[in-house]
Amino acid sequence: MNVPDDLKYADSHEWIRIDGDTGVVGITDHAQAELTDIVFAEPPKPGAKFSAGDVGAVVESVKAASDIYAPVSGEVIEANDALADTPSLINTDPFGEGWLFKMKLSNPGELDALKDSEAYRSHIAL
């Protein structure tokens, strides 16, 4: 199970990669493995605003539909449009091409409530 050290993780299995005051959000390798084959992804539209913990996106697999939560508060600045045609990118490259959305952080202090890679590994019992 891949858990990159340069990301922050939510208990609900989202990750965020920080670059200044923006972040890229996706779901973890653990989450995509639990969902199995993802057949549909609906990222949020640019301009959408979320508080930490709000539903930000939806993914559907052959097994279930799952809400994806915003790990921090902010405004969506870009959605991964490639997922419309190839939602399986979330399975094959969850930390790269399978990202869901980019957001401008409105409260960077919320990052402190997220887990580092070691704490997330413990959370999923790796």
Regions found by a protein language model. Name each.
Residues I18, S61-V62, P71, S106:
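A short, compositionally biased micro-patch
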Residues S66, A84, E110:
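Conserved protein kinase catalytic core
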Residues V76-T92:
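Short, charge-rich, low-complexity interaction segments located
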Residues S61-A64, D81:
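Short, conserved catalytic or interaction motifs in soluble domains
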Residues P46-V55, A64, A70, E75:
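Helix-adjacent hinge/juxtasegments
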Residues M1-V55, S88, T92-L126:
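Acidic, low-complexity mobile loops and tails
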Residues T22, A48, E75-D81:
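Short, solvent-exposed cationic patches
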